[in-house]
């Protein structure tokens, strides 16, 4: 489509700012995200291909894979009709901030085309925008997205600046003013530690260097303010959500305060990259503790592994089923997990298995499955490059085709429409209905809305499906995909208890069938709350169906929240002035009919990152860890388990332990340190509770001795 003229774009942006929650809603469960590596998508402005600020990093032949190739924000806007036609409702773009200006190799080109080598978080990369590093092209794209009722997700990399061993040597700027570099850091803006060698070591992950990238010290008050200001600036330019790079490698406690800062600024949605192979990963319990408590959802790496194993490597479907069941039992908000099977960091599925049926089946699974789906750019065009096993950078191919007629494109469009229309997909529960090595039949249900999906990944063999039960009401259902992936109709007869028998049938090879039923809700049904953690005064949105057009109430215990807006499917309110703790929030319609409750954590105040150190702590054995616990929800409300106490703390200088924790601004908190032993026993320190008054801004530090 034509790009919106800049004057019109500015006006549209102003309208978006006034439009409120409809465009800025925290509820992403019904979205379909299209991930774009900006430099590899489309060249909409050739004047920024070889800018004066960073010359010689562009390759017009698209043969030097570590060079810029010309894709930019204007190019994304040029192709917006293509993206929207596919059913995507949000785009996730690679980091847009100003990146390293110098070549990082002595032979060929090594440039930050990917966006992850920031030098200045406060302005836009000239290769993506313009020679003045202005927000003009960015604002135009965001305005165009919002005028199409689509959302903008920006990737933010809070872990690091740029490489510490080449080019600008990690140099960091604040809107053009030099702050520090890896070899010039008098104020301690960076950590100066070796590269991470043990990715299961909590201290190394958070304080060592990730692949030579100069590691930012978020506990430094200047860096804390800088990173939060960078996010705030993007929000002032109407960004709807953030994908947070490498959250596993950033100081975990600080990230709670970062999320809180973002939510204090404006409605948003945050999801982070916590790389792990499966639910057996040693730090898997840390991952769901982080997601449940921080307000930051996660990219679903365990499910990514399972999808790739099943659809590319022909593993048993039970791997997917087991992964989903495990995660659903661990994550408080599993429908907020962000799901994917391809990305900028791994070989594409078609490199692993060049079978378009398998790709299309995986897409259908992703789009009907639990979580918020991401389509990696070009998958709908079957793009891949097998050089070096298709690994980085060969997975970041040039987007050479925009064909709207591929089967994959059509499947995405159909199922994106289903996700928007049927609440079972975005909000529903998950139930396996039939399973063997090659066939997976699963059901999504949200009250009376039902979606049943049957996938056979075997390209040559059909299977007789007997004993299938479903929550679909009696009737005959046609394939929602209309046969795009060899689907068929299904007849359901009457049963009992939400288990209606389906007629026996043979599932075709290489097939996906989708059957669905939906009704208008007669009573209020809550499917989402976002964010799910915040202090009194924060804006929160509940989404679902059947709320009615007349205003009802939202209750935290007996305390009513102030309603900002009310519609049949979405209610925005202000968290009331209640005590900190966990609440089951209750929505009632104007007639007093109550919906199902949904969990929310009320904080005591906005969050400030504080580093606690306890010297000479209780001696520990392998598997024992020191935690902190205290008298506020931010300190675990005196919890004494791995999931409820705060930690584990870190011990690079054993027997001294430390931990960064986000605490309520201005509050005087009481706390103690405990030793949670490998067998579950808890050893408390003696003496009175420690006491600390949290700063009202910046960062804090407190050091005490273990009380024997």
What is the predicted role of each segment?
Residues 25-32, 39-237, 253-276, 280-283, ...:
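Substrate-binding/active-site clefts of carbohydrate-active enzymes
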Residues 36, 540-544, 554, 571-573, ...:
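A structural motif
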Residues 56, 618-668, 676-695:
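Aromatic-rich carbohydrate-binding modules that target alpha-glucans
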Residues 141-150, 160, 228-333, 337-340, ...:
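Active-site-proximal helices and loops of the catalytic beta/alpha 8
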Residues 470-475, 545-551, 620-624, 631-632, ...:
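Short proline/glycine-enriched turn/loop motifs at strand-loop junctions of beta-rich domains
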Residues 491-507, 676-708:
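Structured interaction patches on ligand/partner-binding surfaces of diverse proteins
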Residues 520-551, 592-605:
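Beta-strand/beta-sandwich contexts
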Residues 587-589, 675:
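Conserved structural position at the C-terminal beta-strand
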């Amino acid at each position: 489509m034509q790009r919106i003229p800049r004057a019109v774009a500015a006006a549209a942006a102003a309208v978006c700012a006034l439009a409120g929650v409809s465009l800025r809603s925290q509820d992403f469960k019904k979205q379909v995200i299209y991930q774009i590596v900006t430099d590899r998508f489309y060249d909409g402005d050739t004047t920024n291909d070889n800018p004066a600020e960073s010359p010689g990093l562009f390759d017009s032949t698209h043969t030097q894979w570590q060079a810029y190739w010309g894709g930019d924000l204007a190019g994304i806007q040029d192709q917006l009709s293509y993206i929207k036609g596919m059913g995507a409702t949000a785009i996730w773009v690679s980091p847009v901030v100003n990146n390293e200006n110098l070549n990082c190799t002595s032979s060929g080109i090594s440039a930050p085309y990917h966006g992850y080598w920031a030098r200045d978080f406060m302005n836009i990369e000239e290769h993506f925008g313009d020679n003045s590093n202005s927000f003009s092209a960015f604002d135009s794209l965001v305005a165009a997205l919002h005028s199409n009722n689509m959302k903008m997700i920006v990737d933010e990399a809070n872990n690091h600046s740029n490489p510490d061993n080449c080019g600008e040597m990690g140099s960091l700027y604040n809107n053009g003013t030099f702050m520090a570099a890896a070899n010039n850091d008098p104020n301690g803006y960076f950590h100066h530690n070796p590269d991470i060698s043990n990715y299961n070591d909590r201290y190394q992950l958070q304080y060592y260097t990730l692949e030579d990238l100069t590691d930012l010290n978020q506990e430094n008050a200047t860096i804390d303010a800088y990173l939060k200001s960078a996010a705030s600036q993007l929000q002032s330019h109407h960004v709807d959500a953030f994908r947070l790079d490498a959250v596993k490698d950033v100081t975990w406690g600080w990230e709670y305060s970062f999320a809180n800062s973002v939510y204090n600024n404006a409605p948003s949605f945050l999801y982070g990259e916590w790389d792990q192979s499966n639910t057996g990963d040693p730090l898997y319990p840390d991952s769901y503790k982080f997601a449940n408590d921080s307000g930051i959802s996660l990219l679903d790496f365990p499910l990514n592994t399972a999808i790739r194993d099943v659809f590319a490597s022909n593993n048993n479907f039970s791997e997917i089923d087991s992964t989903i069941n495990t995660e659903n039992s661990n994550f408080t908000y599993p429908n907020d997990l962000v799901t994917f099977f391809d990305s900028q960091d791994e070989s594409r599925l078609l490199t692993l298995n060049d079978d378009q049926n398998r790709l299309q089946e995986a897409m259908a699974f992703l789009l009907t499955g639990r979580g918020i789906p991401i389509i990696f750019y070009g998958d709908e065009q079957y793009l891949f490059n097998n050089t070096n096993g298709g690994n980085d950078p060969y997975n970041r191919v040039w987007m050479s085709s925009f064909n709207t007629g591929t089967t994959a494109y059509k499947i995405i469009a159909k199922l994106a429409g289903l996700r928007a229309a049927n609440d079972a997909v975005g909000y529903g529960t998950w139930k396996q209905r039939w399973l063997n090595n090659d066939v997976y039949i699963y059901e999504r249900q949200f009250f009376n809305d039902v979606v049943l999906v049957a996938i056979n990944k075997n390209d040559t063999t059909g299977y007789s499906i007997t004993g299938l039960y479903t929550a679909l009401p009696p009737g005959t259902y046609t394939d929602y995909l209309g046969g795009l992936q060899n689907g068929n109709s299904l007849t359901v007869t009457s049963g009992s208890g939400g288990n209606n028998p389906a007629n026996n049938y043979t599932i075709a090879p290489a097939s996906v069938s989708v059957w669905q039923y939906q009704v208008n809700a007669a009573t209020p049904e809550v499917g989402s709350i976002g964010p799910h953690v915040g202090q009194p005064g924060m804006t929160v949105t509940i989404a679902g169906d059947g709320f009615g057009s007349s205003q009802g109430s939202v209750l935290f215990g007996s305390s009513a929240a102030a309603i900002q807006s009310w519609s049949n499917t979405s209610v925005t309110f202000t968290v009331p002035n209640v005590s900190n703790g966990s609440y089951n929030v209750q929505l009632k319609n104007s007639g007093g009919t109550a919906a199902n409750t949904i969990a929310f954590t009320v904080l005591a105040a906005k969050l400030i990152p504080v580093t606690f150190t306890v010297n000479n702590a209780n001696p520990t054995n392998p598997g024992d860890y020191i935690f902190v616990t205290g008298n506020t929800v931010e300190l675990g409300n005196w919890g004494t388990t791995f999931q409820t106490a705060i930690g584990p703390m870190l011990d690079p200088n054993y027997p001294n332990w430390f931990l960064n924790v986000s605490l309520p601004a201005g509050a005087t908190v009481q706390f103690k340190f405990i030793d949670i032993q490998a067998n579950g026993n808890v050893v408390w320190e003696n003496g009175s509770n420690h006491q600390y008054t949290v700063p009202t801004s910046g960062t804090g530090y407190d050091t005490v001795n273990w009380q024997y």
